[in-house]
């Protein structure tokens, strides 16, 4: 068992990274930043200017905003300015009413919002909100993670500044992890210390159930429950996992006002790290303790990988979260640490390179690809099969294999990221 102080640090890390969110986290982070700037201003903004990193812009362009029936940043910004409460963090607009929505639409119609790309920054996650009213101006900046405020000012007077030299933001700090530590924590920590992770199951399975009541996104989750799909995939654990995972994503990307438990700033990653594990545990008749440990393993694996990948990248986050769920499912199958390492290598060999082209309804398709690969990788590992160091980017050392994955996503795919954003922003030219 890990030492008490190490366990406490990891538990704190999980609490920080696994949090509730309503709607896609990128537009909600923008709404949060605007809400804080409006609070600093102390009155209703007459004008809102927002400067964003390319990755934030990419992830917020085509996704539904909860409770509005609208997509994109303008309505998120308007609602953040008018009804948002920063104390709610990524649930910033959870008190939205029909009246508030109409006011938001009016705010947009009056051309009070200006959205631009922030130039000269290296941060993948950067949001700067500037609110103006009469002769007053307030500024709030979020960087590094979705709720991490690093700068606040009112009328030029700095209230808070946690930025590094030359306006850069100091690197996000966290607990240094490796897969062995993740495994040891998840499998040996007293269960009462980690049972809080069941909240992720409660949130995300409920989101899946609510999603099946409506018609959100591409309805992938619902379609998996229909006769045609059942005839192809059967009434199996596999089909149930895909349905329960994709449906929660359908709802979230479709703008349903349904909270989910996120992971590392992403609701889809939270869904992907939770629902496959929870569904498998139920159908496999695993114990409550086994479920708790599997969910912890899944979420902490995703957090570990995101530490080197970064909050936002050119690599689809569902790849990362699916690696976590594959580890959790492998554990529920009775696998040991070696089996989990093999499952991770199988995942990296299969899914590395899947691009992120923004948050949108079709994310449910990518989630389904990730989750189906997670099940396949876990099954292969339990049969003693895994991709070896003689093949491609896989290394004998599982942590080096993970670093190979994240290096490709963070460094090698930078030009890919630029091209994706260029395509997305010029489709109507």
Where does each model-flagged region fall?
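Acidic-glycine-rich active-site phosphate/pyrophosphate-binding loop
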Residues: 1-11, 43-56, 236-255, 288-305, ...
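Signature of multi-pass transmembrane helix bundles
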Residues: 109-255, 420-429
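Conserved phosphate/anionic-ligand binding catalytic regions in large, soluble enzymes, centered on
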Residues: 20-36, 258-275, 316-320
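Flexible, glycine/charged-enriched surface loops at secondary-structure junctions
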Residues: 44-48, 88-93, 114-116, 193-197, ...
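Early transmembrane hairpin of solute transport permeases
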Residues: 31-121, 126-128
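N-terminal signal-anchor module of multipass membrane proteins
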Residues: 2, 6-40, 45
